[in-house]
């Protein structure tokens, strides 16, 4: 099994393999995007630079601190929890493979090639997966998708026509909450005013209020 994983990774270092395709998906003739069922795409995640994502160690510590009980639970919590479990297990297997390669592959050049590929290409994909699902659990999926779209628009806009700073994910939920509150309060402020002007007596107020409720 370890030899199969080794051949799998080495075969994926071929420059003809598109970066947007998962390695197993390419081998079986399938174009698999792990973000599609969540409303995003690999291309949408690719707008974020590689140094944007924290290290795998930091992301694993965050997932453990926030969602360890749910991740270790035998029950199904959400699709994001399930995806997090799979990503964490996948990274553990990759670390086992890297250790095996370091101990058993005699050719230093081949060993460095495999280890570098795991740390850069595969490591980046794991960092993206972990960040996406942790962020969706923390801020909400719609907020994360809105952020990805906003960042994609910002990064593709020429510097002369865009704000100097990129959008920040943690500020989007505050803006969204304010918008929802304003929308919810506006009808409440407008509806009482005409009733007070039109009803000169308390009896009319009661009758009109009953009619409005019906």
Swiss-Prot record:
GO cellular component: extracellular region; host cell; host cell cytoplasm; host cell nucleus; T=4 icosahedral viral capsid
A Pfam family that the UniProt record links to this protein: Hepatitis_core
Compositional bias of kind Basic residues: 178-207
Post-translation changes: Phosphorylated. Cleaved by host furin.
Subcellular location: Secreted; Host nucleus
InterPro entries (alphabetical): Hepatitis_B_virus_capsid_N, Hepatitis_core, Viral_capsid_core_dom_sf_HBV
Propeptide feature ranges: 186-214
Chief place of localization: secreted
Sequence repeats: from-to residues: 186-192, 193-200, 201-208
Keywords: Disulfide bond, Host nucleus, Host-virus interaction, Repeat, Secreted, Signal, Viral immunoevasion
Cross-referenced SUPFAM superfamilies: Hepatitis B viral capsid (hbcag) (SSF47852)
A biological process from GO: viral penetration into host nucleus
Subunit structure: Homodimerizes.
Family: Belongs to the orthohepadnavirus precore antigen family.
HAMAP family, alphabetized: HBV_HBEAG (MF_04076)
Protein name as it appears in the record: External core antigen
Organism: Hepatitis B virus genotype A2 subtype adw2 (strain Rutter 1979)
Lineage, highest ranks first: Viruses, Riboviria, Pararnavirae, Artverviricota, Revtraviricetes
